Each structure stands twice: as C-alpha cells, then as structure tokens.
Amino acid sequence: FQDDNCAVSMIFGIIKALIDSGYQPRYTIAVCALAAEEWGVCDSKFDWSTGAWNQVFRVHPEWQGRVIADLNFELPAHAHNTQDAIRSTYESADFLKHFCENITVPKEAYPDGLTVLAPIETWSDDFSIAISGIPSTVNDFSAGPFMETHYHSQYDNEEFYQEAVYRFHHELYTRLLVTLDQLTLPPLDFSRHFLAMKSSVADCLAAQSNAPAEVLEEIPALLESISKVCESADLLYEKIQEINNHTVSADFPMVSGLSSKLLHIFRKMQDYFVRLDWQDAVFFPHSAASLLPSD
C-alpha cells in the first residue's frame, strides 16, 4: 500500500492538479513509475533500483545533462517520524532549506516541522538517478519502526494511511515542482559537497594516527585546496542565485549553455566523490582508507 501504490497515486494527484489549474510548465515534466521489483534482477541486493538505473542509463540516456531535477516519492502517506524531511544530494541542500523556510507544516502531520537531509541514500531510486548526473530528492522514509515491522510485507496496508501526511506531501511537492520549473538554472551549490569532503578528510586523519609521515605532511595542503575550491563554489552559487532571482539579465543561449555545464560538473562530482561502503552507505573514496586494518 505505502510501497509504492501511494507514491504512484501521489504522482497522478500532483499532475492532475497542475493540469486542472491550467499551469503551463516552462520545462518538460516527465512522469515515471519505474521502481517496481518486477523490473529487478535475481540474486542482486540492488533489485529495487534496477528500473531507475536502466531508465536513465539505457532507455533514456538523453536525460543525462538535460534534466535539472528528479523528485522521487517513497511511502508518502505515512509519517515515519515526528519531523518530515526532504533528502537530497549535497548540492541541492541549500536551495531546499531556503524553500522549506516558506512552508507551513500542519502539526497533525509532523509536530516537529520539516528539515533537509543530505546526502541521498541507496535504498531508493533517486540514488541511481543522481549518479547519472541528475540532481535528485526523495521524501525521507528511512526512520521509524514501519521499516522494521511492516515494510515489504502483507502488513503494509491501508491501516497505516495518514491523510494529513498524504495531503501535506501533495501540497509540498507540487509547490517544489512549480518552484523548480520557474528557475533559469539548476540551483546547485557545490560548496556543500566540498565542505562535507573537508570534514571527512579530517575524520579520516583522526582515525589514522599511524599514517605515514609523508601522508600527514600533505593533509594541510589538501585542506587548504578544498577551502579554496569552496570559495570558488560559493561565488558560482551566488551568480546562479542572481540569475534565478532575475537580478541580472541572461539571454537564453547563454543560460542553456550554463545549465549544461553545471549539470556536467554535478555528474563529475558524482563520478569522482561518491562511493559505497559494505553497508551501502554513501561516503567519499578516501574514507575507504580508514576502513582498512592497521598494521
């Protein structure tokens, strides 16, 4: 019921609302329901994500470098915690936090409001979409007892339907979709990813007290380089915001080229800096060194 009939019906509800309102989208809005295990493969722990991976890498590779956002929905008619969350890639977190500041969350749905989490996780299709170079989000569903007691079982039924939660998610993601549709450039703040990387380097250093001296000597220079990249990324994001807020003029050919370049950078960030540990948690490649046994 929750996984994932409610998500599919929510897609229909959002699109019907846009059509009935007469809204004319600026971008093409593609509606996809591609996460069913029937699309999966045998003897694979990633069967649930095979549908999304095949869609974006094999069936529609032309989406890569063109689509500015992916909104994924999972179990959206049940409150998995007292606080709702939009989970996204690092690069979209700042934009989403500012978006959420103007959202009124009904207390009967989520008493503790709404927050933004990053990075995305592997247990839903937005991960496959993101590593193809499309900035992705999902309504966070990983917390709470439902995932341990009812998920993927016959107990996932209409008894756990929460209308206030479902209505709020309809309204929240319709508003987010329209907000994204009105942007000129994809709202990507690359500094967030590099800041997380800087923190990760420091954590790895602390975990490797017996690292070779030549490695330890290079760490300060590495951290300084990351800081400089963050400064450049901050300036880039300021320019993106200026264009999206229409505080500076930009002709369409230039904007189209900028959008493609931003999405190209995003794809490279995924290619170079996103890896998984043995528990399928997202981490940085250099973090693997801290998982190796010491001599």
Range-by-range predicted roles:
Residues 67-70, 75-195, 199, 206, ...:
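Active-site-adjacent substrate-binding region
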Residues 15-22, 33, 59, 103-107, ...:
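Sec/Tat-exported extracytoplasmic proteins
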Residues 1-91:
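Acidic/histidine-rich catalytic neighborhood of metal-dependent amide-processing enzymes
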Residues 49, 60, 84-97, 104, ...:
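Short, structured coil/loop segments at alpha-helix boundaries
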Residues 27-29, 33, 62-77, 104-113, ...:
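Hydrophobic transmembrane alpha-helix bundles
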Residues 190-191, 197-295:
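Mature extracytoplasmic or organellar-lumen-exposed domains after removal of signal/transit peptides
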Residues 47-58, 92-96, 131-143, 205-224:
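Short, Lys/Arg-enriched charge-dense amphipathic segments
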Residues 29-37, 44, 74, 86, ...:
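A sequence-level detector of short, solvent-exposed, charge-rich linear segments
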